[in-house]
Amino acid sequence: MYLISFLIYPTVTFIAVMLGKMTGGIRLSDTNITIKAYIGILLVQIATQFIKNIFEESVWRAYLTNQLLKLKLSDLKIYLLVGFIWWFWHLPYIMVFLSESEIYDVLPVGRLTFFLIGFIVTACWSVMYTEIFRMTKSLWPLVIAHTMEDAVINPLLLMKIVSVEKSQAIFFSLSVGIVPTILYLIVGLTIRRWRKSRNKVGE
């Protein structure tokens, strides 16, 4: 599961970029960024984001998800509750700290619309994160997954290696687009099926 957690975001990002490129929704830059430069930035991102995500995943999974599991709630309720609280926690960041131009670079919509779309995204992501936690009973695969999300996507956009066409950003935005979000949901539901089949075998 550790390897899966490490590979989820790079794999989904690669698929989304390739689909976007084939449909004209994504352009790969002609910039002369070397692999060495990208790997250097990637490693710096991994180091810094790893520390931040220890604290974040300690709250969302090690505490919140763990407490909700003790209440014997349905899977759907857990996904939605964790997704909602995780989403609402981002309210100050999106409504105050993010500039209009930064939001527009991700998705060409207004601030409030961007925030509301975020709930759908976090709800879908929470399926994946919740199921990884239930499979492993460990914080660390989640820290790894969350770190890779920040580390892989940010350099691609900041270094302008990948450019998403505004007219198709709703589909191919690497962080909130429909295509990657559906892929992350599929990953989460697949892990859920794996967990349930494993539990049946153990009964």
Can you annotate each of these PLM segments?
Residues 1-18, 28-41, 66-81, 171, ...:
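Interfacial transmembrane-helix boundary/kink motif in multi-pass membrane proteins
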Residues 6, 42, 46, 50, ...:
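Residue-level signature of the transmembrane alpha-helical core
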Residues 9-15, 84-93, 147-157:
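Aromatic-anchored segments of alpha-helical transmembrane domains
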Residues 21-33, 99-107, 158-168:
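Membrane-interface helix termini and inter-helical loops of multi-pass transporters
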Residues 55-88, 101, 134-138:
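Membrane-interface helix/loop boundary segments of multi-pass membrane proteins
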Residues 64, 94-111:
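Membrane-interface interhelical connector segments
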Residues 121-135:
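Alpha-helical transmembrane segments in multipass membrane proteins, preferentially the mid-helix core
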Residues 135-137, 147-203:
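C-terminal membrane module of polytopic membrane proteins
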